[in-house]
Structures are given as structure tokens and as C-alpha cells.
């Protein structure tokens, strides 16, 4: 593997006569595997313009081969007025470099410029902060990875302090070093210590690019434990019980801030370390959590202004969790300091295998309107829009005389007589997710100062987050789910979504689910049917889960979640679902070798899930739409028909799929549209709508085409969108008629399109055949997808020919399947997650691995929560096979 560097003096190599000065690129090879070749083209004084004009980029480009990683770090010299590089030119130069690297199939990575030790006033300062929002936006639009070296170095200097941080730079007294007899006081260029500090961080971030092996060779099974709640005798007993149950994993620490820091700046990790030692004695690996959702009472007493402010201006009170604003600087200071100390503990204990950030970001809170948020909001708007005139034009603030004369005039979306401007509400939600992700990534920086252990978070569909960007700086996706048994696609949707959040790592972690039922003191929930949870584990592991973890091991006596089932009751007896807990432990032992010898194989049909659209629907919903419900029904309607899919996101590569569906993606970026065009030109099938492309980035209505740039690309005009709720309005398709409800989008399409569905004599569904690919636009969907004959007919025609396992098996509703392969065999892991008996038809005879029985060709029955692993031996390996898999035999 090759890594190529382009940048300025902070990255460059230095000759012996300039030692001890050193660029971080010079130190980087020390932290990489010996087979990784590093070529460093960084040069002192380089700007993005000079790097190109002097031919350095051309030299760099000659080194780029497929999969060559190219790190680009500029800014220090572009910032200087004498070099005459405007921010617009800076962006243009980097964009050009990125695109040329991609043309050679290289992997460009943007780096924010490392921070200087001090600013003009002689104090630690953000001297290069103007580049951060620019580079973040560029990483989004060009879909490249971003390493935020600026915030990492800033926080590193801050933890050392002003004086101690001099050791990272070239500070020399007269005659201290022969190369600098007059001495040197340089707050920009690094000493060997400073260069190695940054190189170590970069190497940690690069691991995903040169480690082909899984992050976790084993599969984990366990539960969340609370050593701070129970006596040490109970902790010892429970850890031993875990071992007897076949568990090998515990998640701990997400709420124990006060036990670790009982008073400000006073730390006590003795309980945590004893717990880790106890788990290690029983062979239990640990996910150690950062307890930032529960700042202690001493913090909120000392900093009451840090409490979340509600929309009506009232303050939340101490208690529950997530009661403090994550933008508050005092909170961040304490959080970062504690996080680094926890990471130091983690590095000391070999059974700590990962760290989890916080717990379920935005689970109980959403927006905050405190004074910190107000100040940061105005800065954020300035960074995003550059001029207040541009903001006004983007938001259309002439409506209702909302025009702003300065960024400081822009209001928070507090309580008003009616609604705020939709663009303002969207921007404030975007600000909230962006600043939360900044906080999360800063926690990662604190962790990586001490350890290279993988970092995760337990996200979920119900929270208002931007998950693709949240997990960009993390190592593996994690999630929590408590899906009901009568809606099994709500569970498998998690598997198909979180597996695809990290483009270079298909592993994922289930960090919380229930043994039988969720619940709290205001919500008693019924237990799952017997067998359902075991099938969740079985199909989850098949779908590439690396952990299946219960919340929690021992039920709580206190708090608010006492009705929630656990492995053991609070008094230590088996709780509801205990038989399944035992069964899953046995199952893990049984299937672990099969999982180890096979790899998950992705489906060839993908659906785009959009957190951007989720944000839009929280604002523009018409009183009827909820994005999560819309998407779950759409996804579930395919799964129930036996169509296996991957759930991807806007920045996912499309070329590995045969069909891509993009429902409810309200804003189509120029980047995504370009990918759509390339995908269809290469022979892909693209199915768009409903409501796809109907809003702008600012959540406004389009200016020249009702579907904005997407409509222009499709060639549509006469576009109208309206609700048919309460009206007699039917969709006609394939000789069938069904009523529609809520929004429909009608349009006129060019002659090279075929109208395939109409609503009251208006075009609703249309198809265009290209030389290779195909495009379909859906202006509406039937009201009840799971029972719609029209939708079933559409799927038979348009999707089933691309279903990955169509030549092996056909499954009825309830049967979920995942495909795994070894070098010699194909396996289908199938489970009936439905409430009733289901059927499947084998087109080829197979061998069932769990029972050791042969399965004949033809129809078979599968009882509720019955699990099978059907295997065939490969006999043909062909890259040109029209079904994209090796033909198997029994």
C-alpha cells in the first residue's frame, strides 16, 4: 500500500541541518506497517496555488495508483495575505486536486491545518478556524474523508497548558542546538515530539485503510452492567453468571460520572478498575463508555447556565439524563478531561476492546436555545452563508418582513404566534446536529490522545442526528433497538442500515436490546413472543453483527426503568426471557465457527436512507408525515416480499448495486445527481420518489422546476404537488386501481419516457429506458403498501429480476435471509421472524448446517422463530455471471 502526502512545512520532511525541526509527515512511517510506502511531497511555504504551479502536485499525482491514499493539508500559507490566495481559490485548488486523484482511483483525504501553539496575544487560540467549516463542507460535497488535525492539536495543546506545550515546538535557548546557535522560539513548526504526536493520531485514523481483517475477530454476546449500582459481591456473582451463560461481553460506565469524579477535578477510578479486573477474570471483554449524558449535581450547581434551555425560554432542571447542553464550554471542558482519563484507564486493561461515546445522543432532548447556542448560532450562520445578504436570499426573508441586517439579528426559532420560516428552522436543526457532531468528534480526539482502541456510539432511528457524519470519525457503527415482534422489519432495518454507515467497515454492534420487553414507570410493555429474541440474535449475527448486547444484566430497583426486563431480576433470579438468554449463549457457540469461515455478501438492491430528509420531515410534514414511519413501511414492503436490500446513504458509492431506490429524498445535491447520472449510464436501474427532489437544500420550494435540479435532469415540466386526502383519487397501474392518500406529485414527461401509472388522467409513474440503464419516477405510492396489489405487481416487474437469491430460494412473508460465502460454499441464513408459519421454496437442493440434514428442492415450512443455515457448494466462479453469484450445488 502507498500513502502520498501533499502540504506545507508542518507536514514536510526536514534535512539534518534543520533538526530538531520535523514535519508530522516525516514521522508518519514510524507508526505504519512496514509494507506501507510513504511518499512526502509537502514543502515549506506551500499554498494550494504554489503546490500546483510549482509542479509538486503533478509529481504527487504520478505516484497515485488505485487505492493510493493521498493526504492533503494546506492553510497556514494560504491564510497569509502576501500569498494572494482567496478562500474561493483555496476551495477551487483543493477541489481540482481531489478530482484528479479520484480520476486515478486514488483515495484523497482532507486534513484541516494543524493549529499554532499561540495566537497574536500569546495565548492558545483558534488561529486557523476559518478553514474548518470550508473543509467540512468540501469533504461533504466531494465525499472524501476529513481528518480534523486542527481541533485535535488545539485540544492537545490545551491539555498540556501553555508552557508545557512548548515541548511540541522548536523552542531553543541560544547555543542549545548547533543548528540554531541564536536560539529559536517557533510556535508553528514542530519538534520531534510534536511531529510524532500528530503522526500517531494520523496513523490511528488510517487504520481502516490498510487493515483488511475485521476489527473484532470474535462475535460478542453480553449485557450492560452497572458496577456503580451494585455491591462488589453482586458484581462478582453477576460476572461469573455471565460466563456460565456463554457471555463474553459487558458494556459499562455510560452513567457513572459522579463515581469517577465525585468532586470537580477529584478523580477516583478504583471501582472502575476493580470491575474491569473482575470481568477479565471471567473472560469478559468490555465496551467502556464515556459517561457524558449524566453530569453530576456538583456540575449543574456550579454551572446552572449549562442546563438545556427549552423553546419557551425555561431551563431544564438537574435529573434524568442529557439535561446539559453539549455546546456549553464548561461542560465540554470537564467532559474532555474526564474522557481522556477514562481512555488512559482503557489502555491499561487488555479486556477493554472498545469505547462508546456518551449514550444515545439526542434520545431525550432535541434543540437547545441557551445563550451559548445563540452565540454559536450566529457564528455558524456567518461561516455557512458568508454574508447576511446571501442568507436572506437563501431563506427568502422578504416574506413577512423577516429580512435581517446582520447575522447577530437572526433569531433563534423560539415561540412565535405561528410558524418560523422553514429555512430558518432547517438551518437551526442543521446547526444542532453539526455542533453535536463536533462535540462527539472532540471526545474522539480526547480518547485518541491515550489509546487507539476502536470507538463507537449507540445511535438509533428515533433520534435527530446526522449519522453519516457522526460516525465518520468513529471506527464502527453501533445502535440500540427495541423493535416490536409484530413489526419485524423495524428490527432488520437496523441491520441493513447500520451495516452500511461506514463505507470501509461492514461490521456493526447491537449495544442495547431487551431480553423480553422494554419499559419504564410510565410505560409497561408486554414481553416478546418466546423465540423472537433468539431469532433476532441469529439473523443479526448473519447480517454482520459483531455484538448482541442486552440492556441490562440485573434489573434496577430504583430510578425509572424498573419494569424493563433483564437477564436477572433485581433480587438475582432469572427474569423474563431467561430461557432465550441461555439459548443464545448456546447458539453463539454453535454458529461462531460458521461465521468465522464466511463473509457477509451484500444485496444488489439498495435503498437510500437520508438523515437530511428526516430533518426536513420534522419541519415540513403536513401534519401527516413521519420520515421514520414512511421509510419503515417502504422498506418493510420489500422485505415482506422476500426482496433483500441494503440501506445506504447519500454519500455511499452506488456502483456495487444493480438497483438503487431513492424514496422521500427531498433534496438532491449536485453530487448525488452526478452519481445518479453515472450509475444509470453504467447500466444501473434508478427508482426515484415519491417526494424525491421536491425541496431545496434550504427547505424551500424550487425556483425553476418543481423537482429542482432533479426535474431538470429528468426533463419533467408542469409539475404540481398537492394532497388528495379526503378526495377520490386513484392510481391506475398494470390494469389495477387503488386509492391514494396525502401528497401526490404529477408531471409531464418527454416523449422518450413511458407513462406507466396515472392518477385521474395525470402522469404519476413514468419510466425511461437508457442505452444501458433505466430510470423510474414515482409521483405517489399506494396508501397501504404491505397489502397493495399494485405495489406487489410493481415489485415483481421492476425488482424481483434483480433479487440476489432469486435462483436459490423464494421466501414468503416473515422469512428473513442473509447471504454469507466462503471460498468454497454459499450459505443462506434464514429465520422466520413472523408470528405465523411461513413458507420458502428451494430451487436447488441444499444442506442444512445446524441439523446436518439434506433439504430437497421444493416447498418447505418454517415455524415462527425457526432458524436454518442452508448451504451449497460452489461449482462455478464467473465474474460475468448475470446473477452475480457462483452457481451452487448441494
Model-derived features with residue positions:
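Hydrophobic targeting/anchoring helices
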Residues: 456-633, 720-725, 729-733, 743, ...
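Helical hinge/lid and interdomain linker segments adjacent to catalytic or ligand-binding clefts
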Residues: 48, 53, 57-58, 625-704, ...
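Polysaccharide-binding and catalytic clefts of secreted carbohydrate-active enzymes
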Residues: 316-476, 490-491, 497
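Aromatic-lined substrate-binding rim segments of carbohydrate-active enzymes
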Residues: 237-243, 251-314, 443-450
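A conserved amphipathic helix/loop scaffold
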Residues: 664-890
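Serine-esterase "nucleophile elbow" of acetyl-processing enzymes
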Residues: 1-44, 58-68
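Aromatic- and acidic-residue-enriched carbohydrate-binding clefts of CAZyme catalytic domains
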Residues: 165-179, 216, 253-254, 260-265, ...
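Alpha-helical cap/lid subdomain in secreted, periplasmic
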Residues: 56-196, 200-207
